[in-house]
Structures are given as structure tokens and as C-alpha cells.
Amino acid sequence: MNMIIFNSAFLLIFIILLYPLISSLSPKELYPNWSSSHVKTAVKTSFFISLIPLFIYLDQGLESITTNWNWINIGPFDINMSFKFDMYSIIFTPVALYVTWSILEFALWYMHSDPNMNRFFKYLLLFLISMIILVTANNMFQLFIGWEGVGIMSFLLIGWWYSRADANTAALQAVIYNRVGDIGLILSMAWLAMNLNSWEIQQLFILSKDKDLTLPLLGLVLAAAGKSAQFGLHPWLPSAMEGPTPVSALLHSSTMVVAGIFLLIRLHPLMQDNQLILTTCLCLGALTTLFTAACALTQNDIKKIVAFSTSSQLGLMMVTIGLNQPQLAFLHICTHAFFKAMLFLCSGSIIHSLNDEQDIRKMGGLHKLLPFTSSSLTVGSLALTGMPFLSGFFSKDAIIESMNTSHLNAWALILTLIATSFTAIYSLRLIFFALMEYPRFPPLSPVNENNILVINPIKRLAYGSILAGLIITSNLPPMKTQIMTMTPLLKLSALLVTIIGLLLALELASLTNTQLKTTPTLSTHHFSNMLGYFPMVIHRLVPKTNLKWAQHISTHLIDLTWSEKIGPKSTLIQQTPLIKLSTQPQQGMIKTYLTLLFLTLTLAVLIIAI
């Protein structure tokens, strides 16, 4: 009976979420209130329904794999429509629905003047459905459908304000960088189909025991690096801030950017014994978390600071995959979703109240004018730094404890600890510039947060940012044996580096506040502010070099060869000997011509006489 309720609840969730999309296909124009009455209500209802399988799982540990029907048969190769409702999908679905419900409610206020708001909500709903398909998929083909779904919806949503050149560029960047990752996923799927003759995830785990999976796993790491913005494929993530703030909140909290990490979590049994892949994930994640945290230190755009913090946390999740602790990475995904969505909604509230101003240097004093938003932003920033008893602490502290007691790679540990300290610095810098001191914005700014569409979503996410970590860790037993003993210094290392970062940030803030002259631009500051020169090299130098070589080749091949050497010059070279031969006797020498004439006449007379 419980199994029927369990599966029926998930089926009902899909039906309810699809209903607004189906109803929008009607030829009649949608009424203005459609986005609130249909989309928000559907997501809200789905969240409460998703609690039913969650409670059944917590009570009985019930999981299920449901195969609905057979899609395609190619000889012995079957592709089924199959759903896997295990711990990961059962917990992640309510989290994603809860966060999306809050974001949609906030978007009703934030996007109220947009003429295409109904279409905007439809895109957000499709984005969510694609992510749920990805999370619940039990085969690679179905997972790929969800994977491409979040990719194309991110393109449409980042480029929502398509009349802005920056938004179009950012949307193209997102889709191109993700295409690089998609190549890795497609090649991995092709290898698995050729060598294991199956895409069913459970079958892959069984069939792969005696195979060397290094090549397909490298493809999966490339796919995760593209989707989750790891170092090398990260520039699209800060650029994605060109989209509306609700898009940024949904993109960074519970949908697209965690899809790559979730792929590795879902397929982790394939890589748990492959040291090369685990080391690759560990080093890639450590490099990402440090580099992006360093870039966040000098940014002045409030949304870009939060965006780089997302990339840094994704690097931390990748480190956890490399430590062979996928359940900790999943825990961090769930806790991170709440405070990251809240940080973006608070940023959106501030931006809207300050006439679309995003520069934190032009803010200040908002703790008096926007008290609720300021309090929530502070709570979210503290949760991000891993402050004890907030949700981020339960996952972040466990990850760093796991790193401290592992014997894998000391460099990765050091980089991660430095990045943790940097997280505290840029979080406090954001609070100091945006909320404290005196106002630095025009006095006519329409500062106002007295709207339930602003207060309620942020309040719900604040509850999640405070309680989610405690609730999840209290109800879910660990999947692996936890560390039993640890020296006090190792236990407190995460907290110590966070406190060091906070103290350093306070010292830097006081120095900045009391300085009398501008600080000279240091090379390290320039490196961080220019994002490690990465966009300049990849987006300018490489295309410029390609253009230069292409131009060089085209001018030599087409202009010099065809237009000159093969065309006019070739004709000239062929005609010149004939011209010289015919013009040689005609050199203007009259005496010679007369002599030849007389000789010719004499010979002619003699011939005639004879």
C-alpha cells in the first residue's frame, strides 16, 4: 500500500507541474493573473505532495525503481522510461519545489512590470521540471533529456532581456560552455552503450565491475565541469548574472549548476574505486573553490559576488566527490540551495529598491531602511561562511573534517581551507559595504520592502537557511561510517579559518574606511578583479588570434593566389614571351628597316627575273 502511495505521489507531482504548461497551449490569451494562479499554485501544491514520499522514506526507508514503458528497442539494447525514487531524489525534490515556490512568489513582485511575465513563469516551470526529470531518471537517456532541458532553459532565461547585448552574449556563453560539457556526456554514453550494452543505471553498476571505466568517467567529469562551472569552464557563471534576479536565484540554488555535481553523485559507484578520477575531481574542485573565492574578493557587483560564491561552493562539492563522500556533497547541495536562493532574493530586493543599482560601493546604511532584507542577507552570508548552528555549518564542517582526516592530497586541503577563509572575507565585505555605515545612494531611491511578495519568500528561505542542516542531519543516518576520533585542532580547523577570515575582513574594512588616499592597484588585486585574466585570454586573445590567422590565410590564398598569381599574373607570364617575340624586331631602327627593305626588294626582283 505504501509503495502505491509512494509512486502515486510522484506521478501526481508531475501531472500538477505539467498542467499549467498544457493549459497554456490554449489559443486563448492567458489572463494577467495566470502566473500566480496556475504556476505558483502548482509548485506550492507539488511541494506539499512531495512531503508524503519523504515522510514514508523517513519512517520506513522505502525506495523504488519504477519502469513505466519501453521506449525504443535496438536489438538487445532497450531504452525504458524509468524513474528511480531513492534517497537523493526523495529529498532533493521537496527542496527544489520549496525553493522554487519562494522564488516564483518573489518574481511576482520583481517582474510585475514585464509584459511577458506569463511566459517567464512558464520558462521557470519548465526549468524546474527538467531538473526533476534529471534527478529522478534511472537511465542515461532520460537523464540526458533533463540535462539538455536545464541547458536550453538556462539559455532562454539568461537571455530573457534579449534587447540587451550583454544578456545575449551571456546566454551564448552559457550554452557554448555547456556544449563542451555535453560532448563529454555524449561520448561517455556512447562508450557505455558500446561496451556495456545498457544505459540503465542499476545495470551499469553491475556490468562495470570488471571494466576499466577511466575514459567514460573522464567524459562525465568534463560534463560536470561544464554544467557546474568548474575551473576552465567557469566564465559563464558570473556572466549569467545578466538574467533577471529570480533566474539567478533558481539557476544557482537548486537547478542547473548542481546538475553536474548530481550526475557524479548519481553515478558515484562507477568511480569510487578509480583513483585517477577521484584525484582529478579533488584537485579540480580545490582549484575551482580557491580561484573563484579569490575572484569574489574584489568584485563590486552584488550579484557577481554571490555568483562567485556559488562557483566556490560547487568546487567544494567537487572536492567532496573526490574524497569519496558523495552523501556529504548531496547534503551541501540541499543546505546550499536555501541560503543561496535567499542571498539572491535579498540582492534582488536591494537592487529593486535602489533603482537597479548593483554596485555595493553605492549602497550602505540599508540595515535601517531595509531591516528584514538586511537581516536575511546577514543570516545567509553567515550560513555561507559555515557559522555554527546555521544550515551551512552542518554540511561544510563535515566536508572539511572529512578532508582533514583523509590521506589523499594535502595541497587540496590547504587550498580548500584558504578558500573557506576567503568566503568569510567576501561575505563580511558584502555585509559591510551594502548594509552598514551611512547611505551612499541618491536620496530619491524608492526603498520599500513592505510587500508580502518580498517578505514571505525570504522568510521561508531564512527558515531553511537556519534549520535545514539540522533537520536533514537529524533524520538521515550517514551512509558511510563517520569519523570516530579527531584531535581538537582538526575538529575546529574549519571554524578557525572562518574566524581568521572574519577578523581579516574587519581589519581590511576599517583600513578602507579610514584611508585618506586611494590604494595603488596591486598586481594581485588586478588579477582578482580581472577574473584571473581568464575571460580576456579565452574570449579575446584566442578569437583574435584565430581571426588574425584566418585573415592571413584568406589574404594569401584568395587575394594573392587566386586574384593575382593564378589570375592576372599567370596570364601575363604566359603572354610575355609571345609579346617579346613579336615586338623584338620592331625597335624603331629606321636604317635597319630600310636595309632589310632593299634586300627584300632585290631578292624579289632577282626571283622574278629568274
From Swiss-Prot:
Q: Which residues form a coiled coil?
A: none
* GO cellular component terms attached to this protein's record: mitochondrial inner membrane
Report the top EC class in one word.
translocase
GO-annotated biological processes: ATP synthesis coupled electron transport; electron transport coupled proton transport
Q: Does the keyword Transport apply?
A: yes
Pfam families to which the protein is assigned, alphabetical: NADH5_C, Proton_antipo_M, Proton_antipo_N
Q: Keywords on this record?
A: Electron transport, Membrane, Mitochondrion, Mitochondrion inner membrane, NAD, Respiratory chain, Translocase, Transmembrane, Transmembrane helix, Transport, Ubiquinone
UniProt-annotated location(s): Mitochondrion inner membrane
One of the entry's Gene Ontology molecular-function terms is: NADH dehydrogenase (ubiquinone) activity
Q: What is its EC number?
A: 7.1.1.2
Residues annotated as transmembrane: 3-23, 90-110, 120-140, 141-161, 174-194, 213-233, 245-265, 276-296, 305-325, 328-348, 374-394, 408-428, 452-472, 492-512, 590-610
So what does this thing catalyse? a ubiquinone + NADH + 5 H(+)(in) = a ubiquinol + NAD(+) + 4 H(+)(out)
Asked if Transport is a keyword of the record, the answer is yes
Q: How does it sit in the membrane?
A: Multi-pass membrane protein
Record's function text = Core subunit of the mitochondrial membrane respiratory chain NADH dehydrogenase (Complex I) that is believed to belong to the minimal assembly required for catalysis. Complex I functions in the transfer of electrons from NADH to the respiratory chain. The immediate electron acceptor for the enzyme is believed to be ubiquinone.
To which protein family does this belong?
Belongs to the complex I subunit 5 family.
Q: What is this protein called?
A: NADH-ubiquinone oxidoreductase chain 5
